[in-house]
Amino acid sequence: MALWGGRFQGETSALFKLFNDSLPVDYRLFEQDVIGSIAWADAIASVGIISATECRDLKKALNDLLVEVNGDPAIILASGAEDIHSFVESALIAKVGDLGKKLHTGRSRNDQVATDLKLWCQSEGAALLARLQSLHAELLALAEREFDAVMPGYTHLQRAQPVTFGHWCLAYVEMYERDISRLADALTRANTCPLGSGALAGTAYKMDRHALAAALNFAAPTLNSLDSVSDRDHVVELCSTASISMMHLSRMAEDLIFFNSGEANFISLSDEVTSGSSLMPQKKNPDALELIRGKTGRVYGSLVGILTTMKALPLAYNKDMQEDKEGLFDVVDSWAICLDMAALVLSGLKVNRPNALLAAQQGYANSTELADYLVSKGMPFREAHHVVGEVVVAAIAKQIPLEEFSLAELKTFAAIIEDDVYPNLTIEACLAKRDVLGGTALPQIQQAIAAKKAR
């Protein structure tokens, strides 16, 4: 049953119905549509549109419908309804007759779908927050297990300075904490109720919209009916927050793919999250991580899609906004499974400490320490930087690490070098000198882990 047939004399074409109907997408708003309708029944009862008995009967029928559909979700799509609102109203009328036709009094699908979508975003957002927090906890546990596992740190994908795997983990802990904060902020901004805004000008019935918002667990009602029915900022923000978080997940996946490669071999991944080759029997591919990296693009695409859809819409509601859900639903589904998969990857990850340490000892990662040593002897840093560059060139030519130069050889580059240079060139010294807030010294890493666990 269409909710708008009275104005029309001709039949809708089958092609237009296929093009226009949104039930194959918005069926996911069923529970929110029923919950909103129950609250609306109370609201119209409060202004005398229906009696207390009628309100009770409507609410019972809606709750019965909720139970029925939860038991057999296929009922929705089998109905052939235009959208989820049409399905709920038709099913309600089938249960209570003409009484069901009273429920939509004073309400528009415009404020109805805006409310449904905000309720859905609140529910799914809370679940995503829990997933982010689980990933955060898994990463923090890994940081604690491997806090002192030495590995090379990179810039430009070139070995730069030694760090620890715990320090690497804590870098992503920081990123996911920002994701948690961003998502919580977005949900706070979305915590307002559009119901009662009507099609665009507000409902004609003087109901208490504060009470209506409270009944649906919103913090407050929206304050402008035009904005209420045309606002999709919460969709944009959720897609944006997901995109930033997926960027973090993708960067972490890329790091781990490299660390797991035969060229690095710093880590081993569990069989749970890897697959093999149909041709090459020796292969163990990091497919979980590659899929996280790959799914990032589709999340970005949905963000661009909703921004482009909304960018030129006049106030208030336009049918273009029906396109807000498919991308959003895909974003939430993709983000959720990537968060779960990332946590699973981390739970079974093992660090190959000897390989990671060996790589940190190579590549002249202690060059900065030699420069700092020269500075401590009174040489200006820029000059020290140049001198150490010359030492590195000579070391590469001889294919030896810096610490294997004899003192006499080092003195040919700078006469101020003495025997006390060698303790400064060890991996342990490189790490220990970074004993500053945010640094990679082991005490700093332990303090950072303890502080985050205490929150």
From Swiss-Prot:
A GO CC annotation given for this chain: cytosol
UniProt keyword annotations, A-Z: Amino-acid biosynthesis, Arginine biosynthesis, Cytoplasm, Lyase
Cross-referenced InterPro entries: Arg_succ_lyase_C, Argininosuccinate_lyase, Fumarase/histidase_N, Fumarate_lyase_CS, Fumarate_lyase_fam, Fumarate_lyase_N, L-Aspartase-like
Pathway: Amino-acid biosynthesis; L-arginine biosynthesis; L-arginine from L-ornithine and carbamoyl phosphate: step 3/3
Reaction catalysed by this enzyme: 2-(N(omega)-L-arginino)succinate = fumarate + L-arginine
This enzyme's EC code(s): 4.3.2.1
Protein family membership: Belongs to the lyase 1 family. Argininosuccinate lyase subfamily.
Name of the featured protein: Argininosuccinate lyase
Species whose genome carries this gene: Shewanella baltica (strain OS223)
Lineage summary: Bacteria, Pseudomonadati, Pseudomonadota, Gammaproteobacteria, Alteromonadales
